Amino acid sequence: MKEMKTTAQVLVDCLEAEGVDVMFGIPGEETLDLMFAIRDSKIRFIPVRHEQGAAFMADVYGRLTGRAGVCLSTLGPGATNLVTGVADAYLDGAPLVAITGQVGTDRMQLTSHQYLDLTAMFEPITKRSKQIIRPDTVGEIVRLAFKHAEKGKPGATHIDLPQNIAKMPADAVPLKCQQMHEVYADPTHIAAAGKIISEAKNPVILAGAGAVRSHAAAAVTELADRLHIPVVNTMMAKGIIPMDDKYSLWTIGIPQKDYVNQLFDRADVVIAIGYDIVECTPAKWGARENMTIVHIDSAPADVNKRYQPAVEVVGDISESLYEILRCARRTGEPEFALALRQTMVAEHEAMAADDSCPMKPARILADVRKVMGRDDIVVSDVGTHKMWIARHYDCYEPNTCLISNGFASMGFSIPGAFAAKLLYPEKKVLAVCGDGGFMMNSQELETAVREHVPFVTLIWEDSSYGLIKWKEQEQFCGEHCYVDFSNPNFKLLAEAMRCKGYRVEKAEELIPTLEEAFKQDVPSVIVVPVDYSENMKLTEHLKQVYAQK
Protein backbone atom coordinates (compact mmCIF):
# COMPACT_ATOMS: atom_id res chain seq x y z
CA MET A 1 0.00 0.00 0.00
CA LYS A 2 1.34 3.40 -0.98
CA GLU A 3 2.33 5.56 1.99
CA MET A 4 0.04 8.55 2.50
CA LYS A 5 1.60 11.95 1.89
CA THR A 6 2.05 14.43 4.72
CA THR A 7 0.09 17.67 4.95
CA ALA A 8 3.20 19.59 3.90
CA GLN A 9 3.61 17.42 0.81
CA VAL A 10 -0.06 17.74 -0.18
CA LEU A 11 0.13 21.51 0.34
CA VAL A 12 3.00 21.65 -2.15
CA ASP A 13 1.00 19.46 -4.56
CA CYS A 14 -1.79 22.02 -4.23
CA LEU A 15 0.61 24.87 -5.02
CA GLU A 16 1.74 23.06 -8.16
CA ALA A 17 -1.89 22.50 -9.15
CA GLU A 18 -2.42 26.26 -8.84
CA GLY A 19 0.40 26.83 -11.31
CA VAL A 20 2.96 28.08 -8.78
CA ASP A 21 6.41 27.92 -10.32
CA VAL A 22 8.38 30.09 -7.89
CA MET A 23 8.23 30.99 -4.20
CA PHE A 24 10.11 33.62 -2.21
CA GLY A 25 10.99 33.33 1.46
CA ILE A 26 13.25 32.28 4.31
CA PRO A 27 13.17 28.78 5.85
CA GLY A 28 12.62 28.30 9.56
CA GLU A 29 12.47 25.49 12.08
CA GLU A 30 8.67 25.30 11.86
CA THR A 31 8.70 25.05 8.05
CA LEU A 32 11.26 22.26 7.61
CA ASP A 33 8.74 19.68 6.37
CA LEU A 34 7.41 22.22 3.90
CA MET A 35 10.91 23.12 2.69
CA PHE A 36 11.80 19.51 1.88
CA ALA A 37 8.46 19.03 0.13
CA ILE A 38 9.24 22.08 -2.00
CA ARG A 39 12.73 20.70 -2.69
CA ASP A 40 11.15 17.55 -4.12
CA SER A 41 8.73 19.52 -6.32
CA LYS A 42 9.09 21.48 -9.56
CA ILE A 43 8.74 24.79 -7.71
CA ARG A 44 11.76 27.08 -7.64
CA PHE A 45 12.34 28.39 -4.12
CA ILE A 46 14.31 31.64 -3.84
CA PRO A 47 15.81 32.31 -0.39
CA VAL A 48 15.84 36.05 0.30
CA ARG A 49 17.66 38.15 2.90
CA HIS A 50 14.57 39.60 4.63
CA GLU A 51 10.99 38.37 4.59
CA GLN A 52 9.75 41.82 3.57
CA GLY A 53 11.70 41.39 0.36
CA ALA A 54 9.97 38.05 -0.23
CA ALA A 55 6.55 39.63 0.18
CA PHE A 56 7.35 42.49 -2.22
CA MET A 57 8.68 39.98 -4.77
CA ALA A 58 5.44 37.99 -4.53
CA ASP A 59 3.46 41.25 -4.73
CA VAL A 60 5.07 42.32 -8.02
CA TYR A 61 4.95 38.78 -9.40
CA GLY A 62 1.19 38.94 -8.84
CA ARG A 63 0.81 42.40 -10.38
CA LEU A 64 2.58 41.39 -13.56
CA THR A 65 1.06 37.94 -14.07
CA GLY A 66 -2.41 38.22 -12.55
CA ARG A 67 -1.62 34.98 -10.71
CA ALA A 68 -0.93 34.97 -7.00
CA GLY A 69 2.69 35.35 -6.04
CA VAL A 70 3.67 33.17 -3.09
CA CYS A 71 5.89 34.09 -0.14
CA LEU A 72 6.83 32.03 2.88
CA SER A 73 8.17 32.65 6.36
CA THR A 74 8.53 30.92 9.66
CA LEU A 75 6.53 31.92 12.73
CA GLY A 76 7.01 34.93 15.03
CA PRO A 77 9.54 37.48 13.75
CA GLY A 78 9.64 35.85 10.33
CA ALA A 79 5.91 36.37 9.95
CA THR A 80 5.93 39.91 11.32
CA ASN A 81 8.62 40.74 8.77
CA LEU A 82 6.20 39.70 6.00
CA VAL A 83 3.50 42.10 7.16
CA THR A 84 4.46 45.27 5.25
CA GLY A 85 4.71 43.50 1.91
CA VAL A 86 1.48 41.57 2.48
CA ALA A 87 -0.34 44.77 3.44
CA ASP A 88 1.05 46.41 0.31
CA ALA A 89 -0.45 43.68 -1.87
CA TYR A 90 -3.75 43.93 0.00
CA LEU A 91 -4.22 47.68 -0.51
CA ASP A 92 -2.61 47.82 -3.96
CA GLY A 93 -4.75 44.97 -5.29
CA ALA A 94 -1.97 42.50 -6.10
CA PRO A 95 -2.78 38.76 -5.84
CA LEU A 96 -0.53 37.18 -3.20
CA VAL A 97 -0.61 34.12 -0.95
CA ALA A 98 1.49 34.26 2.21
CA ILE A 99 2.31 30.98 3.95
CA THR A 100 3.64 30.93 7.51
CA GLY A 101 4.95 28.20 9.73
CA GLN A 102 3.55 27.97 13.24
CA VAL A 103 4.09 26.19 16.55
CA GLY A 104 2.38 22.85 17.00
CA THR A 105 -1.26 22.96 18.06
CA ASP A 106 -0.28 21.57 21.48
CA ARG A 107 1.60 24.83 22.23
CA MET A 108 -1.03 27.29 21.06
CA GLN A 109 -2.96 27.63 24.31
CA LEU A 110 0.20 28.33 26.30
CA THR A 111 2.76 31.09 26.48
CA SER A 112 5.28 29.76 24.00
CA HIS A 113 8.56 30.71 22.37
CA GLN A 114 7.99 32.91 19.27
CA TYR A 115 4.24 32.21 19.29
CA LEU A 116 1.76 34.81 18.05
CA ASP A 117 -1.74 34.26 16.73
CA LEU A 118 -0.75 34.77 13.10
CA THR A 119 -4.21 34.05 11.71
CA ALA A 120 -5.57 36.99 13.69
CA MET A 121 -2.54 39.15 12.90
CA PHE A 122 -2.98 38.76 9.15
CA GLU A 123 -6.78 39.18 9.12
CA PRO A 124 -6.84 43.01 8.77
CA ILE A 125 -4.36 42.96 5.87
CA THR A 126 -5.69 40.03 3.85
CA LYS A 127 -8.90 39.00 2.12
CA ARG A 128 -8.75 35.67 3.95
CA SER A 129 -6.52 34.30 6.72
CA LYS A 130 -6.88 30.64 7.72
CA GLN A 131 -4.96 28.05 9.71
CA ILE A 132 -4.78 24.40 8.68
CA ILE A 133 -5.85 22.51 11.79
CA ARG A 134 -7.01 19.30 10.07
CA PRO A 135 -4.80 17.63 7.45
CA ASP A 136 -7.80 16.60 5.33
CA THR A 137 -8.77 20.27 4.75
CA VAL A 138 -5.50 21.34 3.11
CA GLY A 139 -6.92 21.10 -0.42
CA GLU A 140 -9.89 23.36 0.35
CA ILE A 141 -7.83 25.90 2.28
CA VAL A 142 -5.21 26.29 -0.46
CA ARG A 143 -7.84 26.47 -3.25
CA LEU A 144 -9.80 29.14 -1.35
CA ALA A 145 -6.64 31.13 -0.65
CA PHE A 146 -5.84 31.36 -4.36
CA LYS A 147 -9.46 31.93 -5.38
CA HIS A 148 -9.84 34.87 -2.99
CA ALA A 149 -6.41 36.29 -3.87
CA GLU A 150 -7.19 36.34 -7.59
CA LYS A 151 -10.94 36.96 -7.87
CA GLY A 152 -12.74 40.34 -7.91
CA LYS A 153 -10.33 43.00 -6.76
CA PRO A 154 -7.18 40.93 -6.19
CA GLY A 155 -5.31 41.04 -2.90
CA ALA A 156 -3.43 39.09 -0.28
CA THR A 157 -4.48 35.92 1.53
CA HIS A 158 -2.75 33.94 4.28
CA ILE A 159 -2.31 30.26 5.18
CA ASP A 160 -0.88 29.25 8.57
CA LEU A 161 0.57 25.73 8.92
CA PRO A 162 1.31 24.40 12.44
CA GLN A 163 4.45 22.32 12.74
CA ASN A 164 2.77 19.12 13.95
CA ILE A 165 -0.01 19.33 11.33
CA ALA A 166 2.63 19.62 8.59
CA LYS A 167 4.04 16.22 9.60
CA MET A 168 0.70 14.38 9.77
CA PRO A 169 -0.57 12.11 6.98
CA ALA A 170 -3.19 13.94 4.93
CA ASP A 171 -6.10 12.20 3.26
CA ALA A 172 -6.42 15.06 0.76
CA VAL A 173 -5.67 15.98 -2.83
CA PRO A 174 -5.46 19.27 -4.73
CA LEU A 175 -8.82 20.64 -5.81
CA LYS A 176 -9.45 21.48 -9.43
CA CYS A 177 -8.84 25.12 -10.32
CA GLN A 178 -12.10 26.32 -11.82
CA GLN A 179 -11.92 29.00 -14.47
CA MET A 180 -13.56 32.21 -13.31
CA HIS A 181 -16.07 33.48 -15.85
CA GLU A 182 -16.40 37.16 -16.66
CA VAL A 183 -19.53 38.94 -15.50
CA TYR A 184 -21.15 41.26 -18.01
CA ALA A 185 -22.78 44.55 -17.10
CA ASP A 186 -26.53 45.19 -17.06
CA PRO A 187 -27.55 46.50 -20.53
CA THR A 188 -29.74 49.20 -18.97
CA HIS A 189 -26.70 50.53 -17.10
CA ILE A 190 -24.68 50.44 -20.33
CA ALA A 191 -27.38 52.49 -22.05
CA ALA A 192 -27.58 54.96 -19.17
CA ALA A 193 -23.82 55.44 -19.21
CA GLY A 194 -23.83 55.92 -22.98
CA LYS A 195 -26.53 58.59 -22.70
CA ILE A 196 -24.66 60.51 -19.99
CA ILE A 197 -21.41 60.41 -21.97
CA SER A 198 -23.13 61.47 -25.20
CA GLU A 199 -24.74 64.49 -23.53
CA ALA A 200 -21.69 65.57 -21.52
CA LYS A 201 -20.16 68.96 -22.28
CA ASN A 202 -16.75 68.45 -20.66
CA PRO A 203 -16.23 64.78 -19.85
CA VAL A 204 -12.98 63.40 -18.42
CA ILE A 205 -11.89 59.78 -18.16
CA LEU A 206 -10.23 58.89 -14.85
CA ALA A 207 -8.45 55.56 -15.34
CA GLY A 208 -7.29 53.61 -12.31
CA ALA A 209 -5.39 50.46 -11.44
CA GLY A 210 -8.46 48.28 -11.97
CA ALA A 211 -8.31 49.05 -15.69
CA VAL A 212 -4.73 47.75 -15.77
CA ARG A 213 -5.60 44.61 -13.81
CA SER A 214 -8.47 43.95 -16.22
CA HIS A 215 -6.26 44.35 -19.31
CA ALA A 216 -8.52 47.15 -20.56
CA ALA A 217 -5.85 49.42 -22.07
CA ALA A 218 -6.98 48.92 -25.67
CA ALA A 219 -10.62 49.59 -24.77
CA VAL A 220 -9.79 52.72 -22.75
CA THR A 221 -7.67 54.09 -25.60
CA GLU A 222 -10.39 53.38 -28.16
CA LEU A 223 -13.03 55.06 -25.99
CA ALA A 224 -10.87 58.17 -25.67
CA ASP A 225 -9.87 58.34 -29.32
CA ARG A 226 -13.30 57.66 -30.83
CA LEU A 227 -15.29 59.87 -28.45
CA HIS A 228 -12.60 62.60 -28.14
CA ILE A 229 -12.41 62.44 -24.34
CA PRO A 230 -9.24 63.38 -22.41
CA VAL A 231 -7.80 60.72 -20.11
CA VAL A 232 -6.12 61.22 -16.75
CA ASN A 233 -4.60 58.15 -15.09
CA THR A 234 -3.75 57.45 -11.48
CA MET A 235 -0.16 56.55 -10.60
CA MET A 236 -0.82 52.82 -10.74
CA ALA A 237 -2.52 53.18 -14.13
CA LYS A 238 0.38 54.86 -15.93
CA GLY A 239 0.47 53.53 -19.48
CA ILE A 240 -3.23 52.62 -19.62
CA ILE A 241 -3.27 54.96 -22.62
CA PRO A 242 0.01 55.80 -24.36
CA MET A 243 1.22 59.10 -22.93
CA ASP A 244 2.03 60.33 -26.43
CA ASP A 245 -1.64 59.92 -27.40
CA LYS A 246 -3.10 63.40 -27.88
CA TYR A 247 -5.92 62.65 -25.43
CA SER A 248 -3.56 61.64 -22.62
CA LEU A 249 -3.32 64.30 -19.92
CA TRP A 250 -0.96 62.15 -17.87
CA THR A 251 -1.12 61.46 -14.17
CA ILE A 252 -2.97 62.77 -11.15
CA GLY A 253 -1.92 62.11 -7.58
CA ILE A 254 0.90 64.41 -6.49
CA PRO A 255 0.06 66.33 -3.29
CA GLN A 256 -0.23 69.69 -5.08
CA LYS A 257 -3.00 70.80 -7.44
CA ASP A 258 -1.53 70.30 -10.89
CA TYR A 259 -2.51 71.23 -14.43
CA VAL A 260 -4.74 68.16 -14.72
CA ASN A 261 -6.88 69.36 -11.81
CA GLN A 262 -8.11 72.11 -14.13
CA LEU A 263 -9.79 69.43 -16.25
CA PHE A 264 -11.73 68.15 -13.27
CA ASP A 265 -12.63 71.70 -12.22
CA ARG A 266 -14.33 72.14 -15.61
CA ALA A 267 -15.71 68.61 -15.93
CA ASP A 268 -19.44 67.97 -15.78
CA VAL A 269 -18.97 64.20 -16.19
CA VAL A 270 -16.17 61.98 -14.86
CA ILE A 271 -15.96 58.49 -16.35
CA ALA A 272 -14.14 56.51 -13.66
CA ILE A 273 -12.72 53.31 -15.15
CA GLY A 274 -11.17 50.82 -12.73
CA TYR A 275 -10.84 53.64 -10.21
CA ASP A 276 -9.79 52.71 -6.66
CA ILE A 277 -10.38 55.26 -3.91
CA VAL A 278 -7.49 53.86 -1.84
CA GLU A 279 -5.05 55.14 -4.44
CA CYS A 280 -6.36 58.65 -5.09
CA THR A 281 -9.23 60.06 -3.03
CA PRO A 282 -12.11 61.93 -4.71
CA ALA A 283 -11.01 65.06 -2.85
CA LYS A 284 -7.64 64.92 -4.60
CA TRP A 285 -9.18 65.20 -8.05
CA GLY A 286 -11.98 67.50 -6.95
CA ALA A 287 -15.20 65.48 -6.97
CA ARG A 288 -18.17 67.77 -6.26
CA GLU A 289 -21.96 67.68 -6.03
CA ASN A 290 -22.67 69.11 -9.49
CA MET A 291 -20.44 66.52 -11.18
CA THR A 292 -21.94 63.37 -12.69
CA ILE A 293 -19.86 60.24 -12.12
CA VAL A 294 -20.06 57.12 -14.26
CA HIS A 295 -18.43 54.17 -12.47
CA ILE A 296 -17.12 51.42 -14.77
CA ASP A 297 -15.40 48.53 -13.03
CA SER A 298 -15.51 44.82 -12.34
CA ALA A 299 -16.68 45.62 -8.80
CA PRO A 300 -19.29 48.01 -7.37
CA ALA A 301 -18.18 51.46 -6.23
CA ASP A 302 -16.86 51.98 -2.73
CA VAL A 303 -19.06 54.04 -0.43
CA ASN A 304 -17.78 57.61 -0.13
CA LYS A 305 -19.78 60.82 0.31
CA ARG A 306 -17.72 62.48 -2.44
CA TYR A 307 -17.97 59.55 -4.82
CA GLN A 308 -21.62 58.77 -5.56
CA PRO A 309 -21.98 57.54 -9.15
CA ALA A 310 -25.10 58.33 -11.14
CA VAL A 311 -24.71 54.92 -12.77
CA GLU A 312 -22.54 51.89 -12.02
CA VAL A 313 -21.51 49.70 -14.94
CA VAL A 314 -20.28 46.58 -13.15
CA GLY A 315 -18.77 43.78 -15.20
CA ASP A 316 -15.88 43.03 -17.51
CA ILE A 317 -14.35 46.47 -18.11
CA SER A 318 -13.28 46.02 -21.72
CA GLU A 319 -16.61 44.52 -22.75
CA SER A 320 -18.46 47.32 -20.95
CA LEU A 321 -16.45 49.99 -22.77
CA TYR A 322 -17.00 48.39 -26.17
CA GLU A 323 -20.74 48.19 -25.46
CA ILE A 324 -20.77 51.87 -24.47
CA LEU A 325 -19.00 52.70 -27.73
CA ARG A 326 -21.88 51.09 -29.61
CA CYS A 327 -24.41 53.49 -28.10
CA ALA A 328 -22.47 56.68 -27.28
CA ARG A 329 -21.87 59.43 -29.81
CA ARG A 330 -19.70 62.52 -29.52
CA THR A 331 -18.26 65.00 -32.01
CA GLY A 332 -15.83 67.88 -31.68
CA GLU A 333 -12.46 68.11 -30.00
CA PRO A 334 -11.84 68.92 -26.32
CA GLU A 335 -10.04 72.17 -27.16
CA PHE A 336 -9.26 73.14 -23.56
CA ALA A 337 -7.72 69.73 -22.84
CA LEU A 338 -5.64 69.74 -26.02
CA ALA A 339 -4.33 73.25 -25.28
CA LEU A 340 -3.57 72.21 -21.70
CA ARG A 341 -1.63 69.22 -22.97
CA GLN A 342 0.47 71.47 -25.22
CA THR A 343 1.31 73.65 -22.22
CA MET A 344 2.28 70.61 -20.16
CA VAL A 345 4.44 69.14 -22.94
CA ALA A 346 6.30 72.43 -23.43
CA GLU A 347 6.93 72.79 -19.71
CA HIS A 348 8.18 69.21 -19.34
CA GLU A 349 10.54 69.60 -22.30
CA ALA A 350 11.96 72.82 -20.84
CA MET A 351 12.51 71.24 -17.41
CA ALA A 352 14.19 68.22 -19.00
CA ALA A 353 16.73 70.40 -20.83
CA ASP A 354 18.53 71.53 -17.65
CA ASP A 355 22.04 70.02 -17.66
CA SER A 356 23.22 71.21 -14.24
CA CYS A 357 24.53 68.86 -11.57
CA PRO A 358 23.32 67.77 -9.04
CA MET A 359 20.79 66.74 -11.66
CA LYS A 360 17.24 68.02 -11.74
CA PRO A 361 14.54 65.34 -11.35
CA ALA A 362 12.94 66.05 -14.73
CA ARG A 363 16.28 65.71 -16.52
CA ILE A 364 17.02 62.38 -14.82
CA LEU A 365 13.69 60.97 -15.96
CA ALA A 366 14.03 62.32 -19.49
CA ASP A 367 17.40 60.56 -19.78
CA VAL A 368 15.99 57.35 -18.32
CA ARG A 369 13.18 57.45 -20.87
CA LYS A 370 15.71 57.73 -23.72
CA VAL A 371 17.44 54.54 -22.58
CA MET A 372 14.36 52.45 -21.79
CA GLY A 373 12.30 50.79 -24.53
CA ARG A 374 8.55 51.33 -24.66
CA ASP A 375 7.88 47.99 -22.97
CA ASP A 376 10.80 48.02 -20.52
CA ILE A 377 9.94 48.25 -16.83
CA VAL A 378 10.61 50.91 -14.20
CA VAL A 379 9.84 50.00 -10.58
CA SER A 380 9.51 53.06 -8.37
CA ASP A 381 10.15 53.14 -4.66
CA VAL A 382 8.27 55.58 -2.45
CA GLY A 383 9.68 59.05 -1.84
CA THR A 384 10.08 62.36 -3.63
CA HIS A 385 11.24 60.60 -6.77
CA LYS A 386 7.87 58.81 -6.91
CA MET A 387 6.10 62.17 -7.32
CA TRP A 388 8.46 63.17 -10.11
CA ILE A 389 8.07 59.78 -11.80
CA ALA A 390 4.30 60.12 -11.61
CA ARG A 391 4.46 63.58 -13.17
CA HIS A 392 7.38 63.34 -15.62
CA TYR A 393 8.06 59.74 -16.66
CA ASP A 394 6.26 58.94 -19.90
CA CYS A 395 4.64 55.50 -20.15
CA TYR A 396 3.24 53.85 -23.23
CA GLU A 397 2.04 50.46 -21.98
CA PRO A 398 0.45 49.24 -18.74
CA ASN A 399 2.69 47.63 -16.12
CA THR A 400 5.81 49.34 -17.45
CA CYS A 401 5.97 51.73 -14.49
CA LEU A 402 5.16 50.00 -11.21
CA ILE A 403 4.33 52.24 -8.26
CA SER A 404 3.16 51.26 -4.78
CA ASN A 405 0.36 53.77 -4.27
CA GLY A 406 -2.29 52.13 -2.12
CA PHE A 407 -0.11 51.25 0.86
CA ALA A 408 2.81 53.27 -0.54
CA SER A 409 5.65 51.24 0.97
CA MET A 410 9.26 52.35 1.02
CA GLY A 411 11.64 49.52 0.17
CA PHE A 412 9.38 48.26 -2.65
CA SER A 413 11.61 48.91 -5.66
CA ILE A 414 14.55 46.50 -5.36
CA PRO A 415 12.52 43.36 -4.53
CA GLY A 416 9.95 44.50 -7.10
CA ALA A 417 12.59 44.90 -9.80
CA PHE A 418 13.94 41.45 -8.92
CA ALA A 419 10.51 39.90 -9.55
CA ALA A 420 10.00 41.88 -12.77
CA LYS A 421 13.37 40.83 -14.18
CA LEU A 422 12.79 37.23 -13.12
CA LEU A 423 9.57 37.23 -15.14
CA TYR A 424 10.91 39.22 -18.10
CA PRO A 425 14.64 38.50 -18.48
CA GLU A 426 14.58 39.94 -22.02
CA LYS A 427 13.49 43.40 -20.81
CA LYS A 428 15.45 46.20 -19.20
CA VAL A 429 14.27 46.57 -15.61
CA LEU A 430 15.18 49.64 -13.57
CA ALA A 431 14.56 50.12 -9.84
CA VAL A 432 14.37 53.83 -8.98
CA CYS A 433 14.73 54.70 -5.31
CA GLY A 434 15.87 57.37 -2.95
CA ASP A 435 18.74 56.85 -0.54
CA GLY A 436 16.18 56.28 2.23
CA GLY A 437 14.27 53.56 0.40
CA PHE A 438 17.44 51.93 -0.90
CA MET A 439 18.68 51.21 2.61
CA MET A 440 15.43 49.46 3.53
CA ASN A 441 15.89 46.48 1.21
CA SER A 442 19.32 46.88 -0.37
CA GLN A 443 20.26 43.45 0.98
CA GLU A 444 18.18 41.86 -1.79
CA LEU A 445 20.91 42.84 -4.24
CA GLU A 446 22.80 39.84 -2.86
CA THR A 447 19.78 37.71 -3.71
CA ALA A 448 19.84 39.12 -7.25
CA VAL A 449 23.55 38.32 -7.64
CA ARG A 450 23.11 34.79 -6.29
CA GLU A 451 20.06 34.07 -8.44
CA HIS A 452 21.55 35.70 -11.58
CA VAL A 453 18.85 38.38 -11.97
CA PRO A 454 20.66 41.42 -13.44
CA PHE A 455 18.49 44.53 -13.09
CA VAL A 456 19.74 48.10 -12.57
CA THR A 457 19.10 50.26 -9.49
CA LEU A 458 19.18 54.06 -9.78
CA ILE A 459 19.61 55.83 -6.44
CA TRP A 460 18.59 59.49 -6.22
CA GLU A 461 20.90 60.73 -3.48
CA ASP A 462 19.96 63.74 -1.35
CA SER A 463 20.84 62.46 2.16
CA SER A 464 17.32 62.94 3.50
CA TYR A 465 13.80 61.62 3.61
CA GLY A 466 13.05 64.01 0.80
CA LEU A 467 9.29 63.66 0.50
CA ILE A 468 8.73 64.42 4.17
CA LYS A 469 11.19 67.31 3.94
CA TRP A 470 9.16 68.69 1.02
CA LYS A 471 5.92 68.44 3.01
CA GLU A 472 7.55 70.06 6.05
CA GLN A 473 8.84 72.92 3.91
CA GLU A 474 5.39 73.46 2.40
CA GLN A 475 3.59 73.47 5.74
CA PHE A 476 6.18 75.15 7.97
CA CYS A 477 7.38 78.15 5.95
CA GLY A 478 10.36 76.41 4.36
CA GLU A 479 11.66 74.80 7.56
CA HIS A 480 12.32 71.11 8.12
CA CYS A 481 13.44 68.82 10.95
CA TYR A 482 14.54 65.22 11.65
CA VAL A 483 14.78 64.17 8.01
CA ASP A 484 18.51 64.42 7.22
CA PHE A 485 21.08 61.63 7.46
CA SER A 486 24.44 60.52 6.09
CA ASN A 487 24.99 57.72 3.60
CA PRO A 488 27.57 54.99 3.06
CA ASN A 489 29.50 54.97 -0.19
CA PHE A 490 26.78 53.31 -2.28
CA LYS A 491 29.17 52.50 -5.12
CA LEU A 492 31.47 50.56 -2.78
CA LEU A 493 28.50 48.97 -1.01
CA ALA A 494 27.21 47.67 -4.34
CA GLU A 495 30.63 46.33 -5.26
CA ALA A 496 30.89 44.60 -1.87
CA MET A 497 27.76 42.65 -2.83
CA ARG A 498 29.40 41.75 -6.18
CA CYS A 499 27.28 44.21 -8.16
CA LYS A 500 28.63 46.81 -10.56
CA GLY A 501 28.77 50.24 -8.95
CA TYR A 502 28.67 53.64 -10.68
CA ARG A 503 28.42 57.27 -9.64
CA VAL A 504 27.28 60.05 -11.98
CA GLU A 505 28.96 63.43 -11.45
CA LYS A 506 27.82 65.23 -14.62
CA ALA A 507 24.43 65.28 -16.34
CA GLU A 508 25.88 64.09 -19.63
CA GLU A 509 27.20 60.93 -17.91
CA LEU A 510 23.82 59.45 -16.99
CA ILE A 511 22.75 58.05 -20.37
CA PRO A 512 26.06 56.29 -21.16
CA THR A 513 26.23 54.99 -17.59
CA LEU A 514 22.73 53.54 -17.84
CA GLU A 515 23.57 51.98 -21.20
CA GLU A 516 26.71 50.37 -19.80
CA ALA A 517 24.90 49.13 -16.68
CA PHE A 518 22.20 47.42 -18.75
CA LYS A 519 24.88 45.48 -20.64
CA GLN A 520 26.17 43.82 -17.47
CA ASP A 521 25.32 40.24 -16.54
CA VAL A 522 25.18 41.14 -12.84
CA PRO A 523 23.02 43.69 -11.01
CA SER A 524 24.24 47.28 -11.22
CA VAL A 525 23.79 50.28 -8.93
CA ILE A 526 24.03 53.87 -10.19
CA VAL A 527 24.18 56.77 -7.74
CA VAL A 528 23.03 60.15 -9.03
CA PRO A 529 23.03 63.24 -6.77
CA VAL A 530 19.69 65.02 -7.18
CA ASP A 531 18.79 68.69 -6.75
CA TYR A 532 15.58 68.70 -4.75
CA SER A 533 15.43 72.47 -4.57
CA GLU A 534 13.14 71.80 -7.55
CA ASN A 535 10.47 70.56 -5.14
CA MET A 536 9.56 73.93 -3.65
CA LYS A 537 10.02 75.60 -7.03
CA LEU A 538 7.36 73.25 -8.38
CA THR A 539 5.09 73.99 -5.41
CA GLU A 540 5.32 77.74 -5.97
CA HIS A 541 4.94 77.38 -9.74
CA LEU A 542 1.76 75.34 -9.41
CA LYS A 543 0.34 77.86 -6.94
CA GLN A 544 0.84 80.56 -9.56
CA VAL A 545 -0.71 78.39 -12.27
CA TYR A 546 -3.82 77.91 -10.17
CA ALA A 547 -4.00 81.56 -9.17
CA GLN A 548 -4.08 82.54 -12.85
CA LYS A 549 -6.54 79.93 -14.13
Residues of each region from the PLM?
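N-terminal alpha/beta PP-like core and its mobile active-site loop of ThDP/TPP-dependent enzymes
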Residues: 1-328, 367, 371-377, 454-457, ...
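Phosphate/pyrophosphate-binding active-site segments
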Residues: 2, 195, 289-386, 492, ...
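Active-site diphosphate/adenylate-binding microenvironment
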Residues: 11, 16, 31-35, 342-420, ...
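A generic structural signal for residues located within well-ordered alpha-helices
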Residues: 30, 53, 215, 359-360, ...
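Charged, low-complexity, helix-prone segments enriched in Lys/Glu/Asp/Gln
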Residues: 61, 336-354, 420, 456-458, ...
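Thiamine diphosphate
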Residues: 99, 107-114, 303-306, 312-314, ...
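Short, surface-exposed loop/turn motifs that are enriched in glycine and acidic residues
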Residues: 183, 354, 358, 480-483
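Active-site-proximal structural scaffolding
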Residues: 224, 253, 264, 361, ...
